[in-house]
Amino acid sequence: MLNSELYFVFPGNLNTNTGGYHYDRRVIKELRKMGSTIKTISLSEKFPFPDELALTHTEDVFSSIPDDSVVIVDGLAFGAMKNVIKLNKNRLYLVALCHHPLAMETGLNPSERELLLQSETYALKNADHVIVTSQNTRKILIEDFSISASQITVALPGTDRYPFAKC
């Protein structure tokens, strides 16, 4: 039986003003509105290229999470923590939140791109479930990463409705 407390794991500062972190905050907010208890856990900001200290800290964090817990991990970290996933895939319910594949980031050199592609492929194939932010990302994960469509949920980002300003 799965633990009722959810863990949401992300690299760096959740209050960083980017679209990805805004999406993460919104997912947490909506899960809480649905009655879920969410424990947020910050990892090193060095992801997706963590050093040994960051990986050791990540291993310690994951080892402290109770067995059978649902752990949602932002893709900026999830795709770059192969060994952590190996150590925990049989005791935790791991959910990857993939905004887009890490190897598709701009500015990567070929060796960085290949490293991320290998690591993220392993990570996604060993996730219990994957949340993506678009139909396009879903299609990429199915076609290029061989992730089963049944393992993927599309949760589109949206905008809040506001009344029109009076003229």
Q: Language model features by range: what are they?
A:
Residues T58-K82, Y93-A96:
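Short N-terminal targeting/anchoring amphipathic segment
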Residues A77-F78, N136-R138:
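Alpha-helix capping/helix-boundary segments
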Residues N136, A155-G158:
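Carbohydrate-associated surface elements
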Residues M1-K46, D67:
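N-terminal subdomain of nucleotide-sugar transferases
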Residues H22, V73, V132-T133, V154:
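Short beta-strand scaffold positions
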Residues S44-F62:
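N-terminal beta-loop-helix "entrance" segment that forms/cooperates
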